[in-house]
Amino acid sequence: MTKKTQDLTSWYDQLLVKAKLICHGEVKGTVCFLNNSWGLWMEIQQLYNDAIANKNQLSAIALTKFQPTTSFCYQVFQVQLPTLSFYSEYQKEKTHIKGFNPELFLINQVGQKQLNDPLVLRPTSEIAFCNLWKKQELSYHDLPLIYNQWTQVFRAEKNTRPFLRNSEFYWQETHGLFVDQSQSEQAAISFWNLYQDLIINKLCIPAFVGLKSESEKFAGAKNTWTIEAIMPDGQSLQCATSHDLGDTFTKSFTISYQSKTNQKMTPSSFSCGMSTRILGAIFLTHSDDYGLVLPWYLASKQVKLYLFDKNNNPKTRALAFLVKDFLEKLKIRFSFIEINNQLGKQLLKGEIEGIPLQMIVDNEKTINIFNRLTRLKTSLTFANLQTEFVNLVNNYHTEMYRKANDLVEQKLARVQTLKEIEQAFKNKKAVLCTVKLTGELEQHLKTKYQVSVRCVFKKSDVTQNCPFTNQPCFDSVLIARAY
């Protein structure tokens, strides 16, 4: 493989093939998910579904990087909505919601019949959920009403890269109705916190979290909360977003609920989503020149256990089955392979696939353990494995985050003068600075430097002069190129 530090684009393309993650589809921007990548997406689904069901508490072997500021206390129903809708619905929303103009795939003909109102392949589902809610007779007893679906969406993208920007991709989207905007805003923040826990704690991705600027937030949203990760090329990757939509969509679709006083009231809504783009973030952040490196909580197989016994020693076999039983009791996701040749080939395959820990039992006394993250081997007796396994996993988890954070720091500049900022842009780094944030400044950044404001943090308590306008400023922001 091309070295990651020499040519990130070539390395990434080769990684996807070597690790058997995808095959390219026939249509530009589409891919065939192979079992190695789809298995990871299924684990993402499990992590999120457990989280919204309040089953996904961090175990004792996790080191918490982020503590949610609000408790999660919502009931979420799993649903599946149609892929097709009418083009006229999107045209209607363009007149109601400034900026709501997703790039659409249109179907103009069904069989031999030309359609007067073309069909649209789902680009997002705000409209679909609004049409669903409009058909339901709702009262204040029914609210909040929150739905989640796992599905695919379609965007007519010009420049595509697998996982990072696709014409067809998979995601989860959660949509909810509430009696007023204070509740929809609180829900948006709660789900944003949930994403942070998953992305930072479970996936070990260092992230910058905050609000989207006015020009970058979701069209129609009162506010959009984002989670941004800096990739090895200095670009920012949007990992997940959560939107307080207020009554923007519900008023447009004349959705109502019956209040306690039997009045028809307009509810507020929110939506949030995370897509298969998160897999691209994982691959870029953690993987190396030898193949995938996967977070412990994500790996479809956390351990591969090999019984390598050429001499048919019953004591060696007994040790292997002791380890197998031990892993089963801990509910570790693992595979057990009995082989008597080509062990090196199997270990190499496991390395490319990013198996966190590979264990080899080839004698009656010790277990050899290969750590994918450090690429180091250790030997433990079964007694030591029992006492040290939690530390093995915890160290893997925390070291993965540390390494990822060190790489982010190399691609990040905390600067304030215009000269420093321009030098950082020249060096293809992301920038943390304080500015006077205006629409004019955002357009200037895009036009002159081809960068954008990715994230807005809490306002600074210290008055500084904006490096671009020389006016007093309080807005702490992350500025970067974006995927």
Swiss-Prot record:
Major localisation: cytoplasm
Residues forming coiled coils: none
Report whether Acyltransferase shows up as a keyword of the record: no
Tell me yes or no: is Nucleotide-binding among this UniProt entry's keywords.
yes
The organism's place on the tree of life at top rank: Bacteria
The processes (GO biological process) annotated in the record are: prolyl-tRNA aminoacylation
EC main class here is ligase
The catalysed reaction is: tRNA(Pro) + L-proline + ATP = L-prolyl-tRNA(Pro) + AMP + diphosphate
- Where is this gene product found? Cytoplasm
A GO molecular function annotation here is: ATP binding
Per the record, its GO cellular-component terms are: aminoacyl-tRNA synthetase multienzyme complex; cytoplasm
Q: Which Pfam families does this chain map to?
A: tRNA-synt_2b
**Alphabetically ordered keywords of this record:** Aminoacyl-tRNA synthetase, ATP-binding, Cytoplasm, Ligase, Nucleotide-binding, Protein biosynthesis
About its domains, the entry says: Consists of three domains: the N-terminal catalytic domain, the anticodon-binding domain and the C-terminal extension.
Q: Subunit notes for this chain? A: Homodimer.
| Protein role | Catalyzes the attachment of proline to tRNA(Pro) in a two-step reaction: proline is first activated by ATP to form Pro-AMP and then transferred to the acceptor end of tRNA(Pro).
Q: Which family does it belong to?
A: Belongs to the class-II aminoacyl-tRNA synthetase family. ProS type 3 subfamily.
Q: State the protein's name.
A: Proline--tRNA ligase
Q: Which organism is it from?
A: Mycoplasma genitalium (strain ATCC 33530 / DSM 19775 / NCTC 10195 / G37)
Organism ancestry: Bacteria, Bacillati, Mycoplasmatota, Mycoplasmoidales, Mycoplasmoidaceae
The protein's gene is named proS
